[in-house]
């Protein structure tokens, strides 16, 4: 049991704990750290594939789809990103410490997703081949 808690603590980088302390002005107990680690990992496994799919759809819409399909995909992408942003606000307004820490974890994932989307868009705009795109992603 103690080893599992140490592993959960190791999964959460100290940078996020510093952010959390600055955000709430208090320290965390081991149970709160463990709960936040589990909830952020569950969020990652549930929503990251959807975000990746939406990023590829958004790139497809901006590069070679018809106008109507491009508009529909853009609306879908923007609505999902705004829904995720509002869920971040509800996480942050929660009273439990684990919810706040999970919101910070989600915000880091969200920022990484936006950077990944910009990176893929820049590659597609260069009109590279699919093999070159795969080699870029391999070294990303």
Curated annotation (Swiss-Prot):
Q: Where in the cell is it found?
A: Membrane
Q: Which ranges does the record mark as transmembrane?
A: 42-62, 65-85, 96-116
What are the record's GO terms for cellular component? membrane
The name of this protein is: Putative uncharacterized membrane protein YAL059C-A
Q: Is Transmembrane one of the keywords?
A: yes
- What's the further remark here? Partially overlaps ECM1.
* Membrane topology designation: Multi-pass membrane protein
Protein's organism: Saccharomyces cerevisiae (strain ATCC 204508 / S288c) (Baker's yeast)
Q: Which UniProt keywords apply?
A: Membrane, Transmembrane, Transmembrane helix
Q: Does the keyword Iron apply?
A: no
Q: State where it is primarily located.
A: membrane
């Amino acid at each position: 049991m103690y080893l599992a808690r140490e592993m959960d603590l190791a999964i959460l980088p100290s940078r996020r704990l510093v952010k959390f302390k600055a955000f709430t002005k208090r320290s965390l107990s081991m149970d709160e750290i463990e709960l936040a680690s589990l909830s952020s990992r569950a969020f990652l496994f549930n929503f990251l594939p959807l975000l990746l799919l939406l990023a590829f759809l958004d790139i497809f819409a901006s590069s070679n789809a018809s106008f109507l399909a491009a508009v529909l995909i853009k609306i879908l992408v923007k609505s999902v990103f705004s829904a995720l942003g509002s869920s971040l606000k509800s996480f942050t307004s929660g009273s439990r410490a684990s919810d706040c820490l999970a919101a910070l974890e989600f915000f880091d994932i969200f920022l990484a997703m936006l950077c990944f989307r910009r990176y893929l868009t820049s590659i597609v705009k260069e009109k590279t081949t699919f093999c070159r795109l795969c080699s870029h992603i391999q070294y990303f």
